[in-house]
Amino acid sequence: LNFLAEEGRCRPGIQLAATHLLRIGVALLGLRITFDQVTALGWIPVATVIVAVIVTVLSGVVLARFFGESPAFGTLTGGAVAICGASAALAIASILPKHPNSERDASFTVIAVTALSTLAMITYPIVVAAFGLDHTGAGVFLGGTIHDVAQVVGAGYSVSQQTGDTATIVKLLRVGMLLPVCLAIGVVLHVRSSETAHSAPLLPWFAVAFALLVAIGAQLVL
């Protein structure tokens, strides 16, 4: 999709950015989440987000099978929609087994989820106003439905300060689901490959770093 990918001189840099730098960036997302933010929401929004993420990922797998795509593609797209858009797509793609269409699937998912997220940033505040949601309800809706963090911030604060704050917290809670989702994927891959000579890692290192940085961020004021 990008002519630079065909340039031999660019490939090492692209490969570095798509692997090591990407995983470091995903791990650093953990610094944006604090336990105080989560507890401030209350248990109902937290439970709703957790259930929604699980259902969305599983729905992606089911719909992929229905349309003749692989479960890996369903996991990739479902995870991107459920968690944090392009960042989740690239993180999940980096731990899924590689196949001839891996790059195509990842590129499609990133482009599609970014386009839909931008469209949602523009249209969802109008939907919120049409349904007359209060600031908290609007924040939960925007943070729980828009894919990427930046678009959630843009949509939320275009409504009000309180809506933006709530939307951001809800969205970061979804980002926090990246760790358990990656863990679940790692467990499935580990079990499926346990009988082969090369067993898949139970949990990718950047997911462990993500969890550690969440704990560190909870103790620091950045």
Predicted features along the sequence, with ranges:
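Transmembrane alpha-helices that form the ion-translocation and gating core
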Residues: 47-80, 120-132, 220
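Alpha-helical membrane segments and immediately flanking helix-loop junctions
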Residues: 69-119, 137-160
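Oxyanion-binding "anion nests"
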Residues: 156-204
